[in-house]
């Protein structure tokens, strides 16, 4: 928690250092100041990676999600070797969805999730884990709503039952 808050504080300080200058330049040009992107407001990739790290670890041990035989099997046999890469992919996906300078290069979401036959209930439980991670790191409700909206937009690609 301290590392992520420290990373967010560093990112926040950097944003404060950058945005006033861009706001002044915007005033001089007659354009409204640029509003920080969701990516910036989440603390950039440091803040996003901290949230991804937490909710990814919680998904592995979540009893609702572990009722799904395919997820449970993956957690028992694949997670140790593949979870670090999955966390990287999730960080890229969220960073891109939040307006960051990254492009998600993983499998299309429907192909990545097909083998798990995820239900709407399981999708909602992953969303709840994301919100719990955002709360853990003190992310404001506005940013939570925006990120959850991006997550929910992927539901038709992820849910198969």
Task: Label the predicted regions.
Residues 2-22:
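N-terminal export signals
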Residues 11-12, 25-161:
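Core of compact, soluble alpha-helical bundle domains
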């Amino acid at each position: 928690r301290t590392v992520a808050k420290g990373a967010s504080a560093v990112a926040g300080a950097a944003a404060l250092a950058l945005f006033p200058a861009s706001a002044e330049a915007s005033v001089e040009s007659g354009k409204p100041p640029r509003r920080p992107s969701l990516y910036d407001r989440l603390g950039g990739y440091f803040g996003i990676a901290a949230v991804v790290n937490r909710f990814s670890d919680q998904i592995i041990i979540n009893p609702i999600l572990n009722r799904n035989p395919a997820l449970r099997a993956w957690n028992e046999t694949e997670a140790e070797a593949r979870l670090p890469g999955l966390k990287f992919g999730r960080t890229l996906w969220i960073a891109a969805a939040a307006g960051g300078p990254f492009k998600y290069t993983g499998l299309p979401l429907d192909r990545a999730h097909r083998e798990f036959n995820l239900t709407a209930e399981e999708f909602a439980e992953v969303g709840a884990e994301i919100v719990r991670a955002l709360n853990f790191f003190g992310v404001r409700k506005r940013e939570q709503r925006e990120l959850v909206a991006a997550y929910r937009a992927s539901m038709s690609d992820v849910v198969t039952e």
